[in-house]
Amino acid sequence: MRADLSQATFIIPIRIESPDRLRNVITTTAFLLENFDTNIIIQEVDKHSVFEKEALPILEDIVEVDIWKNFNFIHKKSDEPLFHRQRVLNEMIMECETDIVINYDCDVILPKESYTLAYKGIMDNIYDCLLYTSPSPRD
């Protein structure tokens, strides 16, 4: 059963410049779709959409839920050599219809309970904002 995170939107800005990044985007997106009833916006900024051509067919094949239920993919064509992540995030926030917005990195998967505990804390007004940082290798 998927956990209810329906009042949240994961925003994931991407530029897929390597096979590793493609694998990570597919893995994280499938993880979110399979485990949570939530909203997801992925915006790819690049000359051509690698996500649409290579990731979407795989996701449609491997994910057992309707991926399009609360999922929005946006491709913005750009010849810009640099990826302006913050600008893309600002654009994506404007697309959100939920009060809770999760700036999500496509290279990260946390334990499922981390998502549900954070969501509950925000919904119960215990937290206004949460930030996850990975522990230092020295810790």
PLM features: residue spans?
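Short acidic, S/G/P-rich loop/turn micro-motifs used as interaction or catalytic elements
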Residues: 15-20, 47-49, 107-110
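Glycine-rich, basic loop-to-helix element that forms the pyrophosphate-binding segment
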Residues: 79-95
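Short beta-strand-to-loop acidic/aromatic patch adjacent to the donor-nucleotide binding site
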Residues: 99-109
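Conserved donor-nucleotide/metal-binding helix-loop-beta segment in metal-dependent transferases, i.e.
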Residues: 115-129
